[in-house]
Regions:
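Hydrophobic alpha-helical membrane-insertion segments
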Residues: 59-70, 132-146, 204-225
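Alpha-helical transmembrane segments
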Residues: 3-20, 57-66, 133-139
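N-terminal "leader" segments that precede or initiate the main folded domain
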Residues: 4, 8, 27-34, 47-50
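Long amphipathic alpha-helical segments with strong coiled-coil/leucine-zipper propensity
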Residues: 110-149, 163-169
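Membrane interfacial helix motifs at helix-loop boundaries and amphipathic/re-entrant anchors
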Residues: 17-36, 68-103, 141-180, 217-261
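Mid-membrane cores of alpha-helical transmembrane segments in multi-pass membrane proteins
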Residues: 10-14, 32-43, 53-66, 82-84, ...
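C-terminal transmembrane-bundle signature of multipass membrane proteins
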Residues: 177-292
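Cytoplasmic membrane-interface segments at the C-terminal ends of transmembrane helices
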Residues: 1-4, 40-61, 110-132, 187-207, ...
Length: 292
């Protein structure tokens, strides 16, 4: 089997270019993310696909579709135009955050579900399961804290003359907004446990990083909900866009870090699934009584 390491290095370089473009709010190359995932797919094919052979290409295809869909627009095309902003309705759009969460998490969730469903069953490693259970509790707990914090802020600061939305509508919108990210986090942790049970520790580390990506995605989904000002200014948003103070030179540090961690997760997953083979898969069993 030919070495695919140059493809993996090129994919990593494109991932760095993509994250750098997000960091400075000016794409280095608008095709960087698409090419990074395409090179990962080529690396998987060259290095040898695991069984079942369709799983890794199917997962990467979902990621490629999302990367093409969200590819930055060409700044040199399209005329400039005025945009007129009008005040919207006072009520909170209940589904705005949920739709934003699906947009952010659907491709990663599909990839994780495909790899989890296609992976062969192996024994559970109790220490790994225990760590994953703690991590899952943290993901769910963070989502609950965010919802409760918004609820308390909206309830404490609501004024009759504010003309804002009802507290129940606000809490419902935020509760729906966190669901896609929580689902991604739990699925990624389940995938990490399954891969660890197969002895694929590198790929398992990639799945853990994918679960970490769910946290800023959760805050971004809440940020898409048009909350009243008094409900939006809460201190529990540890992974929101302003968690790292932006600057003129680096206006988007949190989105850039999120993209870097996400693409690193994909690199580790693909490298761990298609790279090293387990000894039980690579070598035939020795006859009984024979010496190695």
């Amino acid at each position: 089997m030919r070495s695919g390491k140059p493809l993996l290095v090129a994919a990593a370089a494109c991932a760095v270019a993509h994250a750098t473009g997000i960091l400075v709010a000016n794409p280095v190359w608008r095709y960087a993310e698409v090419l990074s995932l395409a090179l990962l797919l080529a690396y998987a094919v060259v290095s040898g696909l695991p069984q079942p052979r369709w799983a890794v290409p199917a997962a990467l295809t979902a990621l490629l579709v999302d990367a093409v869909r969200t590819m930055p627009a060409d700044p040199d095309t399209g005329p400039l135009a005025w945009q007129v902003l009008r005040p919207g309705p006072a009520d909170v759009d209940t589904w705005a955050g949920f739709e934003s969460g699906l947009t952010l998490c659907w491709a990663s969730s599909v990839a994780a579900v495909v790899l989890l469903a296609a992976g062969r069953r192996a024994g559970w490693r109790r220490p790994v399961v225990a760590v994953a259970a703690v991590a899952a509790t943290l993901v769910v707990g963070y989502a609950v804290v965010r919802v409760v914090d918004v609820h308390n802020a909206a309830r404490a600061e609501q004024r009759p003359y504010a003309g804002g939305a009802d507290v129940a509508d606000t809490v419902t919108a935020v509760g729906l907004a966190v669901l896609p990210a929580v689902a991604l986090g739990l699925t990624a942790l389940a995938l990490a446990v399954a891969l660890a049970g197969q002895g694929r520790w590198l790929a398992s580390a990639g799945a853990v990083l994918l679960a970490v990506v769910a946290l800023p995605s959760l805050d971004a989904s809440i940020g898409a909900v048009p909350l009243p000002l008094y409900a939006g200014e809460v201190r529990s948003a540890a992974f929101a866009w302003h968690a790292i103070t932006p600057s003129l030179a680096m206006p988007q540090p949190v989105p850039a870090l999120t993209a870097a961690v996400e693409l690193t997760a994909y690199l580790l997953l693909v490298a761990g699934l298609t790279g090293a083979r387990r000894s039980t898969d690579a070598a035939p069993a020795q006859p009984a009584g024979s010496r190695p």
